[in-house]
Amino acid sequence: MSSDKLPESKRVLVADDDPVMRHLISTIIKQQKYDVVVAEDGRAAFRILQSDSAFKAAILDMTMPFLEGLDLIRYMRTEKRLMRIPIMMITAEQDIKLMASSFAAGATAFLPKPFTPAQLQSAIRMLLGNRQLRKIAA
Protein backbone atom coordinates (compact mmCIF):
# COMPACT_ATOMS: atom_id res chain seq x y z
CA MET A 1 0.00 0.00 0.00
CA SER A 2 1.50 3.37 -0.95
CA SER A 3 1.95 6.01 1.73
CA ASP A 4 -0.57 8.37 0.10
CA LYS A 5 -3.33 5.76 0.49
CA LEU A 6 -2.73 5.00 4.16
CA PRO A 7 -5.55 5.55 6.63
CA GLU A 8 -5.41 8.74 8.70
CA SER A 9 -4.70 6.86 11.88
CA LYS A 10 -1.33 5.55 10.69
CA ARG A 11 0.50 8.67 9.43
CA VAL A 12 2.67 11.22 11.24
CA LEU A 13 4.17 14.36 9.68
CA VAL A 14 7.75 15.08 10.76
CA ALA A 15 9.22 18.48 9.84
CA ASP A 16 12.82 19.21 10.80
CA ASP A 17 15.66 20.76 8.80
CA ASP A 18 18.24 18.45 10.41
CA PRO A 19 18.45 15.18 8.43
CA VAL A 20 19.83 13.27 11.43
CA MET A 21 16.92 14.41 13.61
CA ARG A 22 14.38 13.57 10.86
CA HIS A 23 15.88 10.09 10.61
CA LEU A 24 15.87 9.54 14.40
CA ILE A 25 12.28 10.70 14.84
CA SER A 26 11.09 8.75 11.79
CA THR A 27 12.77 5.56 12.98
CA ILE A 28 11.15 5.75 16.41
CA ILE A 29 7.72 6.48 14.94
CA LYS A 30 8.05 3.56 12.52
CA GLN A 31 8.97 1.27 15.45
CA GLN A 32 5.58 2.17 16.92
CA LYS A 33 3.90 0.95 13.70
CA TYR A 34 3.13 4.37 12.24
CA ASP A 35 4.06 5.64 8.80
CA VAL A 36 5.99 8.85 8.39
CA VAL A 37 5.82 11.71 5.92
CA VAL A 38 8.90 13.94 6.22
CA ALA A 39 9.47 17.58 5.35
CA GLU A 40 12.93 19.13 5.30
CA ASP A 41 11.72 22.63 6.20
CA GLY A 42 8.65 24.61 7.18
CA ARG A 43 7.69 25.48 3.61
CA ALA A 44 7.73 21.81 2.57
CA ALA A 45 5.57 20.93 5.59
CA PHE A 46 3.17 23.75 4.69
CA ARG A 47 2.83 22.40 1.14
CA ILE A 48 2.19 18.88 2.41
CA LEU A 49 -0.50 20.15 4.79
CA GLN A 50 -2.15 22.21 2.05
CA SER A 51 -2.75 19.08 0.00
CA ASP A 52 -3.09 16.41 2.69
CA SER A 53 -4.72 16.66 6.10
CA ALA A 54 -4.90 12.94 6.93
CA PHE A 55 -2.33 12.84 9.74
CA LYS A 56 -2.53 11.25 13.16
CA ALA A 57 -0.06 13.85 14.49
CA ALA A 58 2.64 16.34 13.50
CA ILE A 59 6.10 16.75 15.02
CA LEU A 60 7.61 20.11 14.13
CA ASP A 61 10.99 21.69 14.77
CA MET A 62 10.73 25.19 16.18
CA THR A 63 13.44 26.69 13.98
CA MET A 64 13.29 25.78 10.29
CA PRO A 65 14.15 27.61 7.08
CA PHE A 66 11.42 29.38 5.11
CA LEU A 67 8.68 28.92 7.72
CA GLU A 68 9.14 28.64 11.48
CA GLY A 69 7.42 25.92 13.49
CA LEU A 70 5.30 28.45 15.40
CA ASP A 71 3.98 29.92 12.15
CA LEU A 72 3.15 26.44 10.92
CA ILE A 73 1.23 25.70 14.13
CA ARG A 74 -0.72 28.95 13.76
CA TYR A 75 -1.63 28.00 10.19
CA MET A 76 -2.75 24.52 11.28
CA ARG A 77 -4.91 25.92 14.07
CA THR A 78 -6.76 28.26 11.68
CA GLU A 79 -7.58 25.55 9.12
CA LYS A 80 -10.68 23.55 10.05
CA ARG A 81 -9.38 20.36 8.42
CA LEU A 82 -6.06 20.59 10.34
CA MET A 83 -7.02 22.06 13.70
CA ARG A 84 -7.58 18.74 15.49
CA ILE A 85 -4.18 17.25 14.58
CA PRO A 86 -2.03 16.98 17.73
CA ILE A 87 1.28 18.82 17.35
CA MET A 88 4.54 18.26 19.21
CA MET A 89 7.04 21.10 19.01
CA ILE A 90 10.72 20.16 19.35
CA THR A 91 13.56 22.62 19.77
CA ALA A 92 17.14 22.94 20.94
CA GLU A 93 16.22 26.23 22.61
CA GLN A 94 15.91 25.95 26.38
CA ASP A 95 13.80 29.08 26.83
CA ILE A 96 10.61 28.67 28.89
CA LYS A 97 9.07 31.55 26.91
CA LEU A 98 9.36 29.49 23.72
CA MET A 99 7.55 26.62 25.38
CA ALA A 100 4.79 29.00 26.47
CA SER A 101 4.64 30.47 22.95
CA SER A 102 4.30 26.98 21.50
CA PHE A 103 1.36 26.13 23.72
CA ALA A 104 -0.23 29.54 23.13
CA ALA A 105 0.01 28.96 19.36
CA GLY A 106 -1.70 25.59 19.72
CA ALA A 107 0.96 22.95 20.34
CA THR A 108 -0.22 19.84 22.15
CA ALA A 109 3.22 18.85 23.46
CA PHE A 110 6.74 20.25 23.72
CA LEU A 111 10.00 18.30 23.80
CA PRO A 112 13.35 20.09 24.25
CA LYS A 113 16.45 18.78 22.46
CA PRO A 114 18.56 16.92 23.21
CA PHE A 115 16.33 14.01 24.13
CA THR A 116 16.91 10.30 24.42
CA PRO A 117 15.13 7.79 22.19
CA ALA A 118 13.17 6.65 25.26
CA GLN A 119 12.02 10.22 25.98
CA LEU A 120 10.95 10.64 22.36
CA GLN A 121 9.09 7.31 22.38
CA SER A 122 7.24 8.30 25.53
CA ALA A 123 6.38 11.76 24.17
CA ILE A 124 5.09 10.27 20.91
CA ARG A 125 2.95 7.72 22.77
CA MET A 126 1.43 10.52 24.86
CA LEU A 127 0.88 12.69 21.77
CA LEU A 128 -0.85 9.91 19.85
CA GLY A 129 -2.81 8.82 22.92
CA ASN A 130 -4.00 12.39 23.46
CA ARG A 131 -5.72 12.21 20.06
CA GLN A 132 -7.77 9.25 21.25
CA LEU A 133 -8.80 11.12 24.40
CA ARG A 134 -9.96 14.07 22.30
CA LYS A 135 -12.07 11.78 20.09
CA ILE A 136 -13.79 10.34 23.16
CA ALA A 137 -14.46 13.82 24.57
CA ALA A 138 -15.75 15.20 21.25
What are these language model-derived features?
Residues 38, 66-67, 104:
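Residue-level signal for the "D+5" position in two-component response regulator receiver
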